[in-house]
Amino acid sequence: MKITILSVGKLKEKYWKQAIAEYEKRLGPYTKIELIEVPDEKAPENMSDKEIEQVKEKEGQRLLNKIKPQSTVITLEIKGKMLSSEGLAKELQTRMTQGQSDFTFVIGGSNGLHQDVLQRSNYALSFSNMTFPHQMMRVILIEQIYRAFKIMRGEAYHK
């Protein structure tokens, strides 16, 4: 089993990197995890809708170029389906039972994901109707993946 977290932009702050490293270590016994960052598109602060779409398209192509054809793609979207921690564990378990073993979670940049990435998605997942910084979202996501594995194995952690 392999899980990839694919995201736009570079993780900059040391504390986010440390949190990610901790969960990568914790996930070691359960799955191979890889974090891939694609560069975010430099853009002015006040963009037109057309400029926003162009930024999303460029970032989207970078993301799509990193997704393996056989990978099950789970995009993080505000309009996606909200799951509990148990629900995420069940969703992953169901897909693994169906023979899926390569998962790519995709986190877009500050303007969201391009339509081409959304069309490649096998599952749209939402953590909230609120917007989170995409650097923070990586930490939240990797923690929830770890929690899902603990739930699937019936191990103490989730309360």
Swiss-Prot record:
GO cellular component entries: cytoplasm
A Pfam short name: SPOUT_MTase
Class of this enzyme: transferase
Residues that hold S-adenosyl-L-methionine according to the record: 76, 108, 127-132
Reactions performed catalytically: pseudouridine(1915) in 23S rRNA + S-adenosyl-L-methionine = N(3)-methylpseudouridine(1915) in 23S rRNA + S-adenosyl-L-homocysteine + H(+)
Coiled coil residues, start to end: none
Function: Specifically methylates the pseudouridine at position 1915 (m3Psi1915) in 23S rRNA.
HAMAP family in alphabetical order: 23SrRNA_methyltr_H (MF_00658)
Protein name: Ribosomal RNA large subunit methyltransferase H
Gene name of this polypeptide: rlmH
